[in-house]
């Protein structure tokens, strides 16, 4: 299967394309990312649930750690009360294993690990682990023997699937780098005051090549000269160019935004719409709630089969294929309940589940079908791997940058023309909105620039960065503009009037 990696250093995100279709989005630089290492401070302890909240020094949420994740801190294995392990204001070295959701903070562990392309260093473990994705028994025996020889005495090693067939010198070189990283973390922890961030994997190029590059990668496109140098460095360091197929690396230099050129913005836009049309004519609705996600499948106008039974089966199989794709592109995790079109035949139900299992097997997040309930609902779970697309856009103003630099993102133009015409743009109506926008979008200097805003579900979205040559810009929705002179968002009527006379001084005051 052909594989193309598109990296946008400007937007700090990347996309993995299979046969021209976007399968996965990769984003870096979140407030809390998996594998970030903090020197935290114990804030609260709840002995009833054997858990504690750790102050990480920023944002609104504290991290959550359970007693089962405090292994290195236990002086004795049989300790079963967290109050015997942690005390208030105690310093603790922790790592994020689950990113925060809209209402919960990040999940933490004291079992620190450092990941490379081929191996994972486990400083607080002495075990040797081989990835389950390595099926060759001879290769597993070889890697285990190699680990016994090279493993540090007080640390453990885990071999990733990419370690198959790799020369020992390359693995030794990576082990050396990981040990140096761990030494750096330890020294930083000793010399720092908690709470503080000690280690963060912010390099989008490194993250993509380490976690997603494989022998099927044929093309890599990147939009930055500096990023291109980093890309060549990591490919050379990890000896990715020694594989049977050497990928073609291209620097993207067209005027069109790279996210538009490869359809990434369009894919994100479509993934924000609850309704998804099926190829055969049916459709489905995807609604994500706090507890679970609901998917409802409908046949719509599809009626190209000889019988109603065949129509239902084809529609359900088409929906199963699309659901497997939508779970990946939207990064929907947790409990998922699917209401397929009712089928009376158990043979058809079995055929649908077999087809659905086959489609889900291509997903790295390992979705598992739990059961087909008596009501005909398919229940499955999907392992959490970072934030969902909806969470990225809803929870963090930095992720409004998802849509920056794109002046033709079609989904952000879905407005109700009738309501727009009826909207009254006066000083009293706009005052609260303007204050909110200024507070949300211009609290950080890197966002203080002329910008477009769009209203989606009562949420303002930044559409694009505009050239610094323009002093103001009318928006399509609210008729608001950003004034460089006053560093505020103002109603267009007030600002345009100020070009001829100072009629907006009363409003600014």
Swiss-Prot record:
GO cellular component: chloroplast stroma
Keywords: Chloroplast, Endonuclease, Hydrolase, Magnesium, Metal-binding, mRNA processing, Nuclease, Plastid, RNA-binding
Transmembrane spans: none
Residues annotated for Mg(2+) binding in this entry: 296, 339
Enzyme class of the recorded protein, top EC level: hydrolase
EC number assigned by the record: 3.1.26.-
Cofactor note: Binds 1 Mg(2+) ion per subunit.
InterPro entries assigned to the protein according to its UniProt record, in alphabetical order: NA-bd_OB-fold, RNA-bd_AU-1/RNase_E/G, RNase_E/G, S1_domain
A GO biological process held by the record: rRNA processing
SUPFAM superfamilies the record matches: Nucleic acid-binding proteins
Recorded GO MF terms: endonuclease activity; metal ion binding; RNA binding; RNA nuclease activity
Cofactor field: Mg(2+)
Main location: plastid
Subcellular location: Plastid, Chloroplast stroma
Record PANTHER family: RIBONUCLEASE, RIBONUCLEASE G
Family as reported in the entry's similarity comment: Belongs to the RNase E/G family.
Role summary: Involved in intercistronic processing of primary transcripts from chloroplast operons. The endonucleolytic activity of the enzyme depends on the number of phosphates at the 5' end, is inhibited by structured RNA, and preferentially cleaves A/U-rich sequences.
UniProt-recorded name of the protein: Ribonuclease E/G-like protein
